[in-house]
């Protein structure tokens, strides 16, 4: 076991105990200090981010991934503001969600408490570093971060700044830490750090999620992989459908709530596809379509079986013509990742059937999948989008970083 993991694990465990009973004011003061320090030391962050970008460009990293990695003054301000916004959210810790009395006179309550020490493994998104720190701090959890090698310089600087801010705020050393060793061996050991980690949350592409699920012995909350579909029903508004798919695919193609597949009812395909594909191509999207799609719009690439299950995270879209709503639902439930799915239709009964039968964390009617986000749902910042069913599902805000403690009041009862 890597010595860095043991040292940081012990520090995190100690910090989590102190954080578990820190007051809301103490935690909020820490968050405001973090926000202030991030803005004050923006130039230091950008200097380190420049190093990461230069390395990524040398490696031939895609433009979409470079966009996830890149920071500028506006993005750093946005990150800092997101941290400050967490102060405005209600502190769930200590909340008694229910209280009931037993016939023997015992009063039993259910209280929200921190999870303890949260481990987060993620890829080339430096904003995750600050988001995760803020959410864990607000909920009284210590956090150990393991970012990707692509953003190591940016992440180390951000955590250094966060640590300095927490020290000034009087919060414990070890509240927010990051692994400096980004090797796969250390990552695997991190996934098995059961003596110190209470939960592990991976954020990234399918490869990362699979590696964590297959190797971790620490309990995992699976997040992130988004093979999201937009289904255009035969009773869809054409203009609305075009607007939704263009937004869902191109507004930020490298995020997990971006659309990766477009399914079109055969009754509307000849009218809809030429307009939609033209609009998508104008945004630089490569179309990979089924044979029926290619028969309608010839100037596209043919999709393979592999395409239907793939999360591109790029300016690529799979397009398939389907017979009806039932085939669309069947296709989504077969190839989807239970993240976010959307139907565009004017038919109420079709929309209700879609909502009921599609198995996903977020199911939309006449809206872009890009709204699956803690901020857009009104939860504030998020730790990720859970695609599993145990503990948490969908955008994970503050409450999803807590667990229950039963508190029992008696007056001498014995059994």
Swiss-Prot record:
Molecular function per GO: glutamate-5-semialdehyde dehydrogenase activity; NADP binding
Pfam families assigned: Aldedh
KW Cytoplasm (keyword) present: yes
GO cellular component terms listed in the entry, alphabetical order: cytoplasm
Localization: Cytoplasm
Reaction equations catalysed: L-glutamate 5-semialdehyde + phosphate + NADP(+) = L-glutamyl 5-phosphate + NADPH + H(+)
The EC number(s) this enzyme carries: 1.2.1.41
Gene Ontology BP annotations: L-proline biosynthetic process
Pathway: Amino-acid biosynthesis; L-proline biosynthesis; L-glutamate 5-semialdehyde from L-glutamate: step 2/2
Major subcellular location class: cytoplasm
Major enzyme class: oxidoreductase
Domain of life of the native organism: Bacteria
Keywords: Amino-acid biosynthesis, Cytoplasm, NADP, Oxidoreductase, Proline biosynthesis
Family: Belongs to the gamma-glutamyl phosphate reductase family.
Biological function: Catalyzes the NADPH-dependent reduction of L-glutamate 5-phosphate into L-glutamate 5-semialdehyde and phosphate. The product spontaneously undergoes cyclization to form 1-pyrroline-5-carboxylate.
UniProt xrefs under NCBIfam families: PRK00197.1 (NF001221), proA (TIGR00407)
The protein's name: Gamma-glutamyl phosphate reductase
Organism: Clostridium perfringens (strain 13 / Type A)
């Amino acid at each position: 076991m890597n010595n860095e993991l043991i040292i940081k694990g012990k520090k995190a465990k100690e910090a989590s105990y102190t954080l578990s009973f820190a007051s809301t004011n103490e935690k909020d003061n820490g968050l405001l200090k973090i926000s202030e320090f991030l803005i004050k030391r923006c130039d230091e962050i950008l200097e380190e981010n420049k190093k990461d970008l230069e390395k990524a460009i040398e490696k031939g990293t895609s433009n979409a991934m470079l966009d996830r990695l890149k920071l500028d003054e506006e993005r750093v301000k946005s990150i800092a503001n997101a941290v400050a916004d967490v102060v405005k959210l209600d502190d769930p810790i200590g909340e008694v969600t229910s209280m009931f009395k037993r016939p023997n006179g015992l009063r039993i309550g259910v209280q929200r408490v921190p999870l303890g020490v949260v481990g987060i493994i993620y890829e080339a998104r430096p904003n995750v570093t600050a988001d995760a720190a803020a959410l864990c701090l607000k909920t009284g959890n210590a956090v150990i971060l393991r970012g990707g090698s692509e953003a190591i310089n940016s992440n180390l600087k951000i955590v250094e700044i966060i640590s300095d801010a927490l020290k000034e705020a009087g919060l414990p050393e070890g509240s927010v830490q990051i692994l400096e060793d980004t090797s796969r061996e250390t990552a695997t050991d991190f996934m098995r750090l059961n003596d110190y980690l209470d939960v592990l949350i991976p954020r990234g592409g399918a490869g990362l999620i699979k590696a964590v699920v297959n190797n971790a012995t620490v309990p995992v909350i699976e997040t992130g992989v988004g093979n999201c579909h937009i289904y255009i029903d035969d009773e869809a508004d054409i203009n609305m459908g075009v607007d939704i798919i263009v937004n869902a695919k191109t507004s930020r193609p490298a995020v997990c709530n971006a659309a990766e597949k477009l399914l079109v009812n055969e009754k509307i395909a000849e009218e809809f596809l030429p307009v939609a594909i033209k609009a998508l191509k104008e945004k630089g999207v490569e179309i990979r379509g089924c044979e029926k799609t290619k028969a309608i719009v010839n100037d596209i690439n043919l999709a393979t079986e592999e395409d239907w299950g793939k999360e591109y995270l790029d300016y690529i879209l799979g397009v398939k013509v389907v017979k009806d709503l039932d085939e669309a639902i069947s296709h989504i439930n077969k190839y989807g990742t239970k993240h976010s799915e959307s139907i565009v239709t004017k038919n109420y009964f079709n929309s209700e059937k879609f909502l009921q039968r599609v198995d996903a964390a977020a199911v939309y009617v006449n809206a872009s999948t890009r709204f699956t986000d803690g901020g857009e749902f009104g939860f504030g910042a998020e730790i990720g989008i859970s695609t599993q069913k145990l503990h948490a599902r969908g955008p994970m805000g503050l409450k999803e970083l807590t667990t229950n403690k039963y508190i029992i009041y008696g007056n001498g009862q014995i059994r």
